[in-house]
């Protein structure tokens, strides 16, 4: 750390209670009051260095002059250093006191008009030559500039802006190593590698080497100015987002950051070490952080945005803040994880366990960015990313519905509205939505047959896997209409599969006749395997037909079949969720 030693005389100042006495052998003729401390000094050393004190005491007629300097920058501690400088007593100028000394010198008008190498010149030179060129010293100087009594004059003298500019320049430098004369403090977990330049050993650092320092030492107003300056220098938006994220995790307790002791209360959060954060302070900090985050898609992790959203609900942040977060999450919903999407319901009137309304708004924002025509156009150009994104979101929402479905207070309309936002054609399989529907029906046994049928409109029975079909065919909770549709489509699938195997076997027979004799054995083995597969499929089909016959024999089944099949002349097929009154025909299987 840089320092500047001034003066050569030994210590002559002594404190008695709240009074500073200067023991030089001469009777004091000046008393200066600074807050709760008084200084008994002499006119000549002070007036020869300070234009302000010269003007002040020249108007006084008393033998002993009295002055009050309660608003001097830095308070009694800084004025003591100024007084020692005037008497030529040894003092040390450091990055911690340089700013307050510079401001106090300006306040007291200690310019070159009142002696060579006066305090304004010396402190200004020290700041320019030693403090602003060093990262650590600039941080310390800026931290001291934020003191209430120092800040106004520090702003007027452009000390704050120069500190911020110096820090921003170093943060933006491509080569942020010790060549530029500033120590660095890497975030925890960051590794460094050793590199050599002309035989000189240095440490290569990552782009986030400055995150810890600015997050630890700068309050929010100064951090905002710093990050805006860095951003104006063209730094990548991803680095800006990473820095803001680091700052939030370190300074927003309810976000779940480094200070693990303590627990939130209605009034605020106490994290030990006499550190207390009111909900109002945290809410204000969170809202400012959301404004600082770059709006560019995917530069901020979806996980962090969801954590911010959850915290904003706990702190009852402004509606604008929550809407901004929901919109940004919606833009990159395909990057979200299910566990992060399970946001507890923080509303006073909330009955449900999770906030499904917020998730629905997030999904609405995502769907606004999804245009099927654009997807088709990009697919023709060989870009499958849009389709992959919405497929991932469909799987995510199916999983979310399965998690919230067991909540007895979740209304049917809410469940349907959320599930219906996903277009049917983007799901490669409907097993996920079927699982969610089954859980919901199980948790809500009071649903009527009609309501269950409406719920099943969310899935397409033709897109269920073999395992899901087997489960659905034996699921007594499903409406009978849906069970019949599942059986019908599975039977059609088996017939198609059998026909495909038979067609393949005929082709193999034709080909085997043209092959040489030594290949006939292999062809016969293939044919034997095909026949066994066909036999297995026929047995499976027969088993399903028997299950269907059992349903038909019941009274309810007869009434149901007479209702949905009617005349055999109607032969339209209806996937689950479409064509509710169209007839279904299940042809008989000949044994």
UniProtKB/Swiss-Prot annotation:
SUPFAM superfamilies: POZ domain. Pfam families: BTB (PF00651), NPH3 (PF03000). The modification Phosphotyrosine is found at residue 434. The keyword Phosphoprotein applies. GO terms for biological process: protein ubiquitination. Residues 28-95 form the BTB domain. PROSITE patterns: BTB (PS50097), NPH3 (PS51649). Residues 208-493 form the NPH3 domain. Belongs to the NPH3 family. May act as a substrate-specific adapter of an E3 ubiquitin-protein ligase complex (CUL3-RBX1-BTB) which mediates the ubiquitination and subsequent proteasomal degradation of target proteins. PANTHER family: OS12G0117600 PROTEIN. The BTB/POZ domain mediates the interaction with some component of ubiquitin ligase complexes. This is Putative BTB/POZ domain-containing protein At5g13600.
């Amino acid at each position: 750390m840089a320092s500047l030693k001034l003066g050569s005389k030994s210590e002559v100042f002594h404190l008695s209670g709240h009074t500073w006495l200067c023991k030089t052998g001469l009777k004091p003729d000046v008393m200066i009051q600074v807050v709760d401390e008084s200084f008994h000094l002499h006119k000549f050393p002070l007036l020869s260095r300070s234009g302000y004190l010269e003007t002040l005491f020249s108007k006084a007629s008393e033998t002993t002059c009295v002055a009050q300097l309660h608003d001097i920058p830095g308070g009694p501690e800084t004025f003591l250093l100024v007084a020692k400088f005037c008497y030529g007593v040894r003092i040390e100028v450091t990055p911690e006191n340089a700013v307050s000394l510079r401001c106090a010198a300006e306040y007291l008008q200690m310019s070159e008009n009142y002696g060579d190498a006066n305090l304004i010149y010396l402190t200004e030179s020290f700041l320019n030559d030693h403090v602003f060129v060093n990262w650590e010293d600039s941080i310390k100087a800026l931290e001291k500039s934020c003191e209430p009594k120092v800040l106004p004059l520090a702003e007027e003298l452009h000390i704050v802006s120069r500190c911020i500019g110096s820090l921003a320049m170093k943060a933006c430098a491509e080569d942020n190593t010790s060549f530029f004369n500033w120590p660095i403090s890497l975030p925890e977990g960051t590794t460094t590698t050793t590199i050599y330049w002309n035989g000189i050993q240095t440490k290569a650092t990552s782009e986030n080497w400055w995150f810890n320092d600015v997050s630890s030492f700068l309050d929010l107003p100064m951090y905002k100015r710093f990050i805006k300056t860095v951003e104006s220098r063209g730094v990548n938006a991803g680095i800006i987002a990473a820095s803001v994220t680091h700052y939030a995790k370190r300074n927003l307790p309810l976000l779940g950051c480094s200070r693990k002791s303590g627990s939130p209360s209605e009034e605020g959060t106490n994290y030990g070490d006499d550190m207390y954060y009111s909900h109002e302070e945290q809410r204000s900090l969170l809202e400012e952080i959301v404004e600082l985050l770059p709006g560019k898609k995917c530069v901020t992790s979806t996980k962090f945005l969801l954590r911010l959203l959850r915290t904003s609900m706990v702190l009852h942040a402004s509606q604008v803040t929550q809407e901004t977060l929901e919109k940004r999450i919606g833009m990159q919903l395909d990057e979200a994880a299910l566990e992060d999407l399970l946001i507890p319901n923080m509303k006073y009137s909330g009955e449900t366990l999770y906030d499904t309304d917020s998730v629905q708004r997030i999904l609405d924002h995502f769907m606004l960015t999804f245009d099927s025509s654009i997807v088709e156009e990009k697919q023709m150009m060989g870009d499958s990313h849009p389709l992959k994104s919405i497929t991932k979101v469909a799987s995510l929402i199916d999983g979310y519905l399965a998690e919230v479905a067991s909540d007895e207070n979740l209304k049917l309309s809410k469940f349907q509205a959320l599930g219906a936002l996903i277009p049917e054609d983007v799901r490669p399989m409907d097993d996920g939505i079927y699982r969610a529907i089954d859980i919901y029906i199980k948790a809500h046994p009071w649903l009527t047959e009609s309501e269950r049928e409406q719920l099943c409109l969310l899935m397409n029975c033709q897109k269920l896997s073999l395992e899901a079909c087997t489960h659905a065919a034996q699921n007594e909770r499903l409406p009978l209409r849906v069970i019949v549709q599942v059986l019908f489509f599975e039977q059609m699938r088996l017939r198609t599969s059998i026909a495909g195997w038979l067609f393949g076997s005929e082709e193999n027979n034709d080909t085997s006749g043209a092959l040489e004799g030594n290949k006939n054995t292999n062809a016969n083995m293939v044919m034997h395997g095909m026949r066994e597969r066909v036999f297995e499929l026929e047995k499976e089909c027969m088993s399903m037909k028997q299950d269907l016959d059992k349903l038909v024999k019941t009274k309810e089944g007869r009434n149901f079949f007479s209702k949905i099949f009617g005349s055999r002349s109607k032969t339209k097929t209806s996937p689950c969720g479409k064509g509710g009154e169209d007839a279904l025909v299940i042809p008989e299987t000949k044994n």
